[in-house]
Amino acid sequence: MKTWMYSYLFDCPILVLPWTPHNYYLYHRFHHFLPLCYWHYSADTY
């Protein structure tokens, strides 16, 4: 879980931030990290 949280915080910053017009650019900047999120989540939960 700790590994997943590390990956969640550093590989998927858009998921830990509230969606607002001010950080909307983060989606375009970090959207390619989302697969890493799901991969780490699956690896640590299964």
From Swiss-Prot:
Superkingdom of source: Eukaryota
Its protein name is Uncharacterized protein YIL105W-A
Organism, by scientific name, is Saccharomyces cerevisiae (strain ATCC 204508 / S288c)
